[in-house]
From Swiss-Prot:
Lineage: Eukaryota, Metazoa, Chordata, Craniata, Vertebrata
GO cellular component term of the entry, any: early endosome membrane
Species this protein is from: Canis lupus familiaris
Cofactor: Mg(2+)
InterPro entries in alphabetical order: P-loop_NTPase, Rab21, Small_GTP-bd, Small_GTPase
Record-linked SUPFAM superfamilies: P-loop containing nucleoside triphosphate hydrolases (SSF52540)
Name of the protein: Ras-related protein Rab-21
UniProt GO molecular function: GDP binding; GTP binding; GTPase activity
Amino acid sequence: MAAAGGGGGGAAGRAYSFKVVLLGEGCVGKTSLVLRYCENKFNDKHITTLQASFLTKKLNIGGKRVNLAIWDTAGQERFHALGPIYYRDSNGAILVYDITDEDSFQKVKNWVKELRKMLGNEICLCIVGNKIDLEKERHVSIQEAESYAESVGAKHYHTSAKQNKGIEELFLDLCKRMIETAQVDERAKGNGSSQPGAARRGVQIIDDEPQAQSSGGGCCSSG
């Protein structure tokens, strides 16, 4: 769900709240990416996520305040059926694979199909090849991964949670894309469009003045 709040400050002063979900197989490093981004922490020991965990991050991008609600989902097969519960109303999805594990890349394709089926083309997709610190053990070709990402309307990124590479760029770019999508929805609403895609994502404009603040949608209220 995305909420854009604006008072008298115009577009530059808008505040946006976005929901981002991380998907991928177990052991690809989803939790490590989130912890590195939100808390600048890294643990060499494998961290198993059970069901889903939730972290928040606040940013300022070109004068626009952004609140991110980041959902880190479990990768184990037995939790896959719970996926729709967590990625419902998401504005962005980060689909992570391990560059040393071809099967984890193939599983990303299944997630893409499911997201497109459930959320359509409005959700911003990022396909991420993690663990580039293990480049010598790579089993997924860069060309194949980038070609696939382009074919499904996603952007491809390379990251290393261990070395803290590519993570800031990943989230910054995703935020910019989600802002652009929200602005398109706002313009469509201003032109009288019924904007079914925006309604499905819960995009709304909120008066940012103190007397008109809404108490709902508190997914980014902590962190």
